[in-house]
Amino acid sequence: MSDIASTLKVSLRTLYEIAPSKEKLIISTIDRILTNTAKQAFSAIKDVSSPLSKLRLFTEIGNEAVGPKTKKFEVDLRKIKGAQQMIDFHQNAYIRQINKLLQEAIKAKEIELIDTQAVAMILGGIAQEYSKPEIVMQLNQSPEVSANMITDLIIRGLSKEKQ
């Protein structure tokens, strides 16, 4: 913790007021990053009229959750008690929003009637799946880039207007 306090240029006492342990600090930091990513995604789609365009933009920003901002914490997160529950909470919220956008796309007749929950689970889980250490080694690109490629393929495949 003293190394972290030194790097952040805050007192150790201040750091312990923020989080009582390194593990809690990491969980709080990742929680904040994921919350900010969600806020950014919602802000980006608020003025977009097409549900499918919203979905594309929302998932692109959501896939940033496995980008450089969180990469440095990957190994630590897998070891920290409570971290997976926090990640699951954010991922479940992400999947619910994707499901909602898919339902809106059906109502807007941008896509055919589909099992929106099944598709939402795939779109909302790709990035986390690709961020697993044993999977990262097999990818030709970063988890974020790979997740965006697959997400784009799926969304284009769903679209009634093939691009």
Predicted segment positions?
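Hydrophobic alpha-helical connector segments
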Residues: 28, 39-68, 119-123
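Short coil/turn helix-boundary motifs
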Residues: 22, 47-48, 69, 161
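C-terminal peripheral helix-coil segments that are non-catalytic and often amphipathic
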Residues: 57, 64, 96-108, 124-126, ...
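Generic hydrophobic, amphipathic alpha-helix propensity
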Residues: 4, 29-33, 37, 98
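Helix-turn-helix
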Residues: 1-24, 28
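Short secondary-structure transition hinges
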Residues: 63-99
